[in-house]
UniProtKB/Swiss-Prot annotation:
The gene is setd1b. Its EC number is 2.1.1.354. It comes from Xenopus laevis (African clawed frog). It holds the Pfam family RRM_1. Residues 1799-1916 form the SET domain. Keywords: Activator, Chromatin regulator, Chromosome, Methyltransferase, Nucleus, RNA-binding, S-adenosyl-L-methionine, Transcription, Transcription regulation, Transferase. This is Histone-lysine N-methyltransferase SETD1B. Residues 111-199 form the RRM domain. S-adenosyl-L-methionine binds at Y1915. One of its GO terms (cellular component) is nucleus. The lineage of its organism: Eukaryota, Metazoa, Chordata, Craniata, Vertebrata. GO terms for molecular function: histone H3K4 methyltransferase activity; histone H3K4 trimethyltransferase activity; RNA binding.
Amino acid sequence: MSFKEAKPGERGKNPEDHGRKQAASWMNGMEAANQPSTSAEKKSHHWRSYKLIIDPALRKGQQKLYRYDGLSFSMPNSGAPPVDSVRDPRIGRIWTKTKELDLPVPKLKIDEFYVGPVPPKQVTFAKLNDNIRENFLGDMCKKYGEVEEVEILYNPKNKKHLGIAKVIFATVKGAKDAVKHLHNTSVMGNIIHAELDTKGETRMRFYELLVNGYYTPQTLPVGSDLDASPTVNETPQVVEPVKRTKETAVGASVTPNSSTPFSHDTAYSSSRQGTPNSYSQFTPQSQGTPHTPRLGTPFSQDSSYSSRQTTPAFHYGQDSSFKPRRHENKFTDAYNRRPGHHYVHSSGSYRGPENTFNVTRPQAETVQFPRTPPLSHSSGNNKSAFSPYQGSTVFPQTDDNQYPQTSRDMEYRRTGPPTSDSYSDGSLELKLVKEKPEEPPPPEPDSTTEQKASFAQTPERCATPGTPTLEAEMQHDSLDTRIAMLLKEQRTQLHLISSDQNSDSEIRMEGSPISSSSSQLSPIPPYSSSSHYQDVTPSSRPSSTGLEDISPTPLPDSDDDEPIPGTASLCQNSRSASPIDQINQPVRKMETLDNKELVVGDETPTSEKMDEGHPSSGEDMEISDDEVTPSPITSAECAITSSSVIPILPPGFPPLPPPPPPQSGFPMPPPLPPPPPPTHPSVTVPPPPLPAPPGVPPHHILHHPPPYHHFPVMQGEMMNVLGNHWGGMTMSFQMQTQMLSRMMQGQGSYPYHHFMGGSMQFGNQLPYRPFALSAHLSRGQPWPPLPKFDPSVPPPGYEPKKEDPHKATVDGVLQVIVKELKAIMKRDLNRKMVEVVAFRAFDEWWDKKERLAKQSLTPVKSGESKDEDKQKTKEHITSSLLESWNKGEGLGFEGIGLGIGLRGAIRLPSFKVKRKEPPDAALAGDQKRIRPSHSVDDEDEESERDRDISGTASDLSKKDADAVNIRRRPARPLDSEGEEEVESEGDDGETSDKEAFEKEDQDAGSVSALSSKKRLYGEKEDEEDETQSSGKEEDLVSEEEDITSVASSRAEMDSSDESDESSEYESSSDSDDEIEEEDDDDEEEELVFEDDQSEELDLGQEDYIETDREEDFFKEDVSECSSPVKAEADMELEDDDVQKLEQDVAHQTAQDTSHLRKKDLDVPLVESKEHKQDTFDKMERLSAVPMQQNVFKEHEKAPSPMNEEEEYIELRLEPVPLVPDNAPPAVQEPMIIRPLTPTGAFGESGPVLKLEEPKLQVNLAHFVAEDEDLYPRTPGRDTAAHSDTEVTFQPGLKVAPSSLPLLQSHNKEEECLLPPEKHTGHLKVTKTLSEEELPRTPGRDILVKSSHLGKSQSTETIPATPGSDAPLTGNSLTLTSPHIPGSPFSYLSQSPGIINSGIPRTPGRDFNFTPIFPESNSIFPSHPSGKKSSVDEPDEKSFKEPTSASLTMNSVPSPIPFASPPRGVPHMDIRLETDDLESSDTQAYLSDKLLSEESECEFTKGQLPSTDESAPSPPFPPTDKRKGPKKPLAAHEFEACVALSEGALGKQLFIGQPDSVSGIKDPAAVPLDFRNDGLSENTVHDPIIQKVPLKELENQWNEVLKEEEEDISKHKKSRNSRLNKLYDEFSTLPSPEYSPPRAMFKPRSEFEEMTILYDIWNGGIDDEDMKYMCITYDRLLQQDNGMDWLNDTLWVYHPPTSVYSPKKKKRDDGLREHVTGCARSEGYYKIDKKDKLKYLINNRSLADEPPIDTQGKSIPAQPQASTRAGSERRSEQRRLLSSFTGSCDSDLLKFNQLKFRKKKIRFCKSHIHDWGLFAMEPIVADEMVIEYVGQNIRQVIADMREKRYEDEGIGSSYMFRVDHDTIIDATKCGNFARFINHSCNPNCYAKVVTVESQKKIVIYSKQYINVNEEITYDYKFPIEDVKIPCLCGAENCRGTLN
């Protein structure tokens, strides 16, 4: 069917018609026209298709007959039938088949004629292993993209592998990905170097270095030499290809460096903004070096070509020779040919002619022509960029001179720079003229004029391609005139280039659209091209004037105008299009105005910025997407680079007439090859396009380095500039160093600015490498800011110039928008966070609940209030976040950290809320609890924020503090695992997150093992404890922070401390680090301890925070149990008393806080402690039970001055030292007591708490107690608080007075407190109660209180008295442990009666309180044990010990809250009453025992023996020994004992307290941190856990459990009696329900929890974990108090990363463990026969076993009996058949039968040798088992194969001889029969059976074979000399196979 076949009449119509329609018909199938058409219709072209039915050529005499649409014919009566159904006549089955048409797409060859930036598809590999071959390398690279070519370089001399390879990818992305993923990776044992090497210059340099013997493949300098980073290298590499392209195209004129600056200014270079300017790498070739061509490239980048091409960089290396060629051939032609690229080409043509001339002249004319050529290049080119004429006119001379200079540039002659200065002036003038023809600078000296003339000529050439605008401008005055003017001005203003540049900028600003981009490039190039420009001289200015401003924003007329001196040029040169550049330009301009000297440096920074913006510009050629952005940046960058390079004028460049004699002085790096013509900065305007804008020659000025004085300035500036621009570009250190050093080199000899060097590069005039700015700067000569707008840079009238000015605007707008968006995001996020979390609502709710709980003592209420607090905390967090965000701390886009979520980005405000509004007395108490753990700085910030939000926030913060604590406690389990990790992740943000999360968990109720009620109690009490303990800490903090309301502050601080701890960590380096360590490494207390020792108070606070946190972690678990008790105790406490106490405490705390704020952190802590002491004293008076009163008296006896408080802090840190009973003085002596808490309040807290000041400790403890009193006191809690107080009061004493009462109460009161049964039960229950069972609230409260009190001083001290059968009452325990903030010892103690009175005792509670005791008094061994449990084994021990103690305490909340004695008085020698003495004795006993047992471990661990912990631990043994002599223990001694006995005591305590031992996780134990109020004891345990190896802890736990059980059993009666007494006393209190003993598990340390949590990174996460995580996530989302970060968290399904495949049991079967963990890495090793026997015996035993079961499993057949019957039947059948046929037939029958019914067999490891074949079903005798299958081969082949197999290392022989001629080879192919091993006593035999004339080997059973019995036969090898050992192990084994 031919369209032309249509009739003549139709042809006119049809050809088109047919063509289209028929084509459509062919393509889509013919659509029949429903109606036949006439020929007229055909003529009407209505037909869609036609067919030539009759062709006259085929049928003579006939006319053509067409059929249209299958129906109409061209002739009326054609006689041909129409088509019935019009359809596509083609055979569907043929034409529907799609044939892949693979048309080869021609690939552009990258050679010297390649125009435009070379795509960075070529990757150079270095340092490859010499075993890597092309195939391997290709396979390695294929994964990143299609590989077009792979070449490995070999030494031509010896063909040795040079370790260098070239890989050309099909795509830029593939090359980049390969470099990204393969660079600095280990391949075949070598760390390989991969970089983008666009033109292979780096590779060739490597090649030369290696072939010449300078380096070996492994010593080859790759990273630092070339480019510090592959990225930098990539940029140069990209630039290099471009350079080559440019240089080849442009000719030699585009030297890698010298022309590079301009070429970068040109579109090429600008596109290559990522590429370092020519100065960056002295030569473009030196891409690898820090100074990548990028540095020189900047100018070229300014031009559209340059930036893209990065040619300039290449040019540098290429030198004049390369340039001339390219210049002549490509650049000139391309430039002239491409009007659009006039800019680049203009410079190119300039360069081309120049290069041509230079090639010829350069050498001849070094002075003037070089100068002129540089000018022509820089100025001329710039003009060319602006007006082709100038570019062309100047260009020839410039190029000629420059080109030779380019070679010189390669030589790095500095003489050139001065010349280039002259030219620079000229070029500037030209550029300026183009920019503002109106202001051509007056002609300078004749030489200048000559230069100008030459420039004019060259530019004229370029003029044709040049931009008309530039041309017109240039035409306004003759090029010569303009050049002369420019030169004149430049000379006159050589040193005023900065100001001139400003004017230039102004001029360019007129042409800003072009000027911006070209100017950006050009300004620097002008500097480069002429030292004048660099020097901020008038001449430079005229040049700028000549140049049009291409930059988005008009370039500053003067350097001052430029935001950053030199930046304007860079920006403009870089690219007007780049908004960033534009933005930078204005800044640079301003800076330039401000600092002309800075111009050079600034320009360099601009270049850096450009590079930063587009780090890949050089690398990509920026053909990739990067290029587009980079090009603008590149332009500026190039400009900057050029500027830096400029200082090094190519020797060929004639120095600008004015000055820079020093040019020769500059030690130029190897001469920069003339920059590629496209380097004209003006070309930058269209940075993306490689071609420079037409008529825009490279800026000549760029080629001239500024005078030395300018360079020095540039040098310094370059540092800055590089910092900025390259910073964005990721300048490598080496890159910067080299750039600066080279610049410095140039500076020394040249007066040119760095930008001069760059412009020289652009002008291709720089014979020298651009010297690093530092070189010039090093000169110390301030360079006047080089004209930011190099004359070379200003493109002719490019529209892009206009864009450039807009770019600045756009950038500004973008910045504004970004700021607004940030603000909006901040606002919205904060609002959302606040709304979602509803902190305020939650806080209010919590406060309400808390008040209700206090009033009603209802755990639920306390829990509710706790929830409220949680909400408040959340709100507080939110407010803090908002505050910190508002402060602009880090909520930029980067600040927001959207990637990691808000909590990562938002510095979740420290929860150390400094809100000063105490909602109420209770809140005041809470505020007191605020941990002073925040660093002062953080506190200040927080306080400021808090103050801002003070009204709301303070309430919230209070609530938040409580809420946080509450949340934490419920989330304890999470906290233990996750909170720390959260904290570690982002202490600030994550803390709040944690709190929110915990709160949510609590709300969800999923996290807390305890009932919500218990949790609520525990939470509330814990929170209260936490609040109190942290409150104390926070009071200290608040004092520092000026927390007006101690209560609110404390509440907030408490909650915020946990979150703020993290924030503090972030805010304060030391504190942050320490806190982070504490949070993250609570178990690594010693770490923080070291830090803390340096900062006692800060660390103390941190310890508090940490302790609180950890305690919170544990508290949530523990306090869930203990909180109810606490709540009950608290509730028991009269609200009035509590409120009074709280108010007092709050007031004092506020005062203390004010003092603290005034004072240093340490002092404030002390003051707060004093106040706290007073408060505690008040509390003692208010709530002190006789016991507690005594204790308080003791405390009171010990004054608690500020110093004491300070000392108390120290003590808190010092509790580590363990001292015997007589050690009270030691306590008073400064002792470094490290809390054993996981956080290691003491250990971690830098400050060393000194036990010297018992008063201080007492005060602190007292204060804590008051705080606790302020909050509704659960019995255990109060007891804990009092115990803490007492402990604090007398850390060293056996028992503080309160401790004595506690002990007594423990012995008696505790019994009274807890019903005897309860006590007994509690002891047992506590022990029995696991962490799970044990009401978390009680222990928690203890923990919380302990945290609040002093972390170590936990209200929740385990209330188990050492001697008492019943757990020590919280009071006794509390008294026992001095309240040392951050020390495990400080636990508020309350008289058992007070704490426990009226409050039903839950075993967990008492248990929880028990942990408090361990702090100061070993008197309460059981309590310390609980404490220890909390510390060492927070969950188990704490619960155990606390259960007994805290049960007692909880069950009998003491009516009088015991103010914990000042923590500072842990060592007061307080003689306890008889009970107290007993407790003391017990403590002493425990202490001694623990000291002996644990002192080493404790001190070794670096954990201070926690008095509370230790004391609690001892209580059990003391309980037993209470009956024995009782000796007072010094608080410190007790602490030491406790600390030492953390493990041992914990054991003893647990023994003493069956409940604790039972595995009930003491809330105190749960929190590892002393900071946790309930963790006082726990804190001790935590340190122990942390300090003591897990095994030891476990052992200790076991021992403790045993001891506790023994002690419990021994003292059960006494305890029961005491419990009965207590029960009688507190019979009114509801008795805690008996909790069935739970399995006791050693509580995991936070570290362990975190390890488990983060194990997903190692072992992955499975579906189950993901399911529960998702459930938890959903629940959290459903909670009103959800964490803020949940808003930013989306649940995205992710496949499980831990897919557990059934474990292979081979190794378990006896195979060895691979030493290296990888079998492959160990090679082959033989399995010892003994090892084999292990599993072989198993197999044999299995085989020997009756096969019934196995048979049933393995054989689908019937049971064995039926199977046997079947076998028998088959045998009978065979026998019958055998009677009819011969043996052969029988065998054949067997064979066929085998095929019909195959035996079930399997192969597995054999005890005989390697693999064996085993029966999976019973096989009767004489049955065919399997055929030996393989390849039938002849003997000859078998011999050959045997040898080959041996060579291949195949040790086994699988050849089976069938007969004399045939052998079956099963080595490579076969079946399982090949695995049958030889045996001297086989159970099978082989038989050759002939089947269809083929011989087959069949294995028959020789006897009955059981299931799993190995099938063997006798190989019957012939006897040979070389024996093969037989391993069959049979009795009659022959020993050998042959």
